[in-house]
């Protein structure tokens, strides 16, 4: 079959055995069966010079394409801005990104479901204990930051309840399944300044990353994600969670992060997906010292999210790491629920960040956890009937 004419009647013959080319005797087209230019479905073009982009690198979630045309207007414009001292050095231009670069994403992170629930959770039908014991487990484990084994020991020593640490873990996972949809879909009435950062935890000794996005006005955690990599994909998912109740960005919107490259790339994808309604620049606070005016002005916001990281790491440290990513997911979801709805904050006059009328009616923390589970169940029913917000 001739690849150009796509007809069976075209007889092929070897044109040059050393190079492996094939010559069609009907249309006289020479081509290679391994690398055939006629089988390409599309080719990416540079928007500045219309030159075909070259495939440069393969990343986990995207492919990097680059315009290598030395006469490209984009390249020449950037080259004129390079310091002349660097041009005189050998490979001095390599300090800058001068060529047009395009990242072709292999996964559509804007179509992934944000409401995916953890697996292997037990049911709320109690065979040995009841919801009171479950609330005790959550209070000791999440509020007081005890490990699973110390939680089981506290129930035995203080309340005389014999329970294994694995059963405590099952209760926490079940509660997380119920509570997470409520926490993720709650409308936090955000302001116009968001701040973001990432930190790491250990799963069986391997680094896993936690992404946080905070509303600077109320200091609520409005976006979070657990990922096995530090790429742009989980950053997009955390941003989607933070933006899910916004039809467009507020005026004078600021998104403050560190100098990591995933945040500007994620912002580009939001503009590509939603247009001018979600067009924003990342204000990057780089380093630990105020070396420029941007760092000096926005350093307090960066310190705010860093304190959040330390607060979470303080509760995580007692766990001595996790066995799997599901355990990290349910632990983080419960901690965010506690931080946003149950934990008193000094800067808020020792009140919770988000007042929920139903939760304020409970006098004890045990009752608050049970009501959170109830609110989560109602949110799940609303999601099943399409009444909750569409996380896009």
Identify the role of each PLM range.
Residues 1-7, 11:
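Single conserved hydrophobic/aromatic residue that forms the stacking wall/gate
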Residues 28-193, 198-204:
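Short, positively charged, Gly/Tyr-enriched micro-motifs
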Residues 173-174, 224-248:
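Active-site beta-loop-alpha junctions of metal-dependent nucleic acid enzymes
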Residues 250-264, 285-288, 352:
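Acidic/histidine-rich, metal-coordinating catalytic segments
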Residues 259-260, 269-300, 304:
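Conserved beta-strand -> loop -> alpha-helix junction used to position metal-binding or nucleic-acid-contacting
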Residues 293-324:
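Active-site proximal helix-loop segment of RNase H-like, two-metal nucleases, encompassing DDE(D)
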Residues 318-392:
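C-terminal domain-tail junction helix/linker
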